[in-house]
């Protein structure tokens, strides 16, 4: 058990019988009253989010989930199948992938972290950065060079990313999977 004040982003807490990952914490202190902790949470079973507040001294059940490095194997509708180093396969429902689904492609070499709760694979965390090829984007507009000009681009896997104006179809780009932002051309 931890107090709400000790909870940090990345911790997993048990709330109303479900595991919730803490995405953001904000502590507010006032002169007379105790500290209030505002938490932004994501339900690992339902893939939904919420914000809630606690008093700084409130006790919360902190849980540790099993995580395993795996590689993407194949898609069997509606499940994505991942495999660990010992060739054990784990099914993750497509709805539990969230934003990660846009970055998963056949033959990808990046290792993902599969999270387990009660022996069941419930979510997948992509590496911080990945490299994908641009399969469609509009050509650059001539003369539009003032400031940081961005345009939408479709990448392998079907996701859409805002990229710099100089990026063309066929370019490989590095993407930050936490924010979905273009980092650089590779």
From Swiss-Prot:
GO cellular component: cytoplasm
Major localization class: cytoplasm
Any one GO biological process: peptide biosynthetic process
Protein role: Involved in peptide bond synthesis. Stimulates efficient translation and peptide-bond synthesis on native or reconstituted 70S ribosomes in vitro. Probably functions indirectly by altering the affinity of the ribosome for aminoacyl-tRNA, thus increasing their reactivity as acceptors for peptidyl transferase.
A single GO molecular function term of this UniProt record: translation elongation factor activity
Pathway(s) of this molecule: Protein biosynthesis; polypeptide chain elongation
Organism (species): Shewanella sp. (strain W3-18-1)
Any single Pfam family the record assigns to this protein: EFP
Protein name stated in the entry: Elongation factor P
Keyword match Oxidoreductase: no
Family listed: Belongs to the elongation factor P family.
Cited PANTHER family: ELONGATION FACTOR P, ELONGATION FACTOR P (EF-P) FAMILY PROTEIN
CDD domains found in the cross-reference section: S1_EF-P_repeat_1, S1_EF-P_repeat_2
UniProt KW Glycosyltransferase keyword: no
Cellular compartments annotated: Cytoplasm
Top-level division of the source organism's lineage: Bacteria
């Amino acid at each position: 058990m931890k107090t709400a004040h000790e909870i940090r982003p990345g911790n997993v807490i048990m709330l109303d019988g479900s595991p919730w990952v803490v995405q953001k914490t904000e502590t507010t202190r006032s002169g007379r009253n105790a500290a209030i902790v505002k938490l932004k949470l994501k339900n690992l079973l339902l893939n939904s989010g919420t914000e809630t507040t606690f008093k700084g001294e409130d006790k919360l059940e902190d849980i540790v989930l099993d995580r395993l490095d795996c590689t993407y194997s194949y898609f069997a509708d509606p499940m994505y199948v991942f495999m660990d180093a010992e060739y054990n396969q784990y099914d993750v429902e497509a709805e539990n992938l969230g934003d990660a689904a846009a970055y998963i492609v056949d033959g990808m070499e990046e290792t993902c972290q599969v999270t387990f709760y009660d022996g069941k694979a419930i979510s997948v965390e992509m590496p911080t950065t990945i490299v994908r090829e641009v399969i469609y984007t509009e050509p650059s507009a001539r003369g539009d060079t003032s400031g940081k000009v961005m345009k939408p681009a479709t990448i392998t896997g079907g996701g859409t990313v805002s990229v710099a104006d100089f990026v063309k179809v066929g370019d490989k780009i590095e993407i930050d999977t936490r924010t979905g932002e273009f980092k650089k051309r590779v």
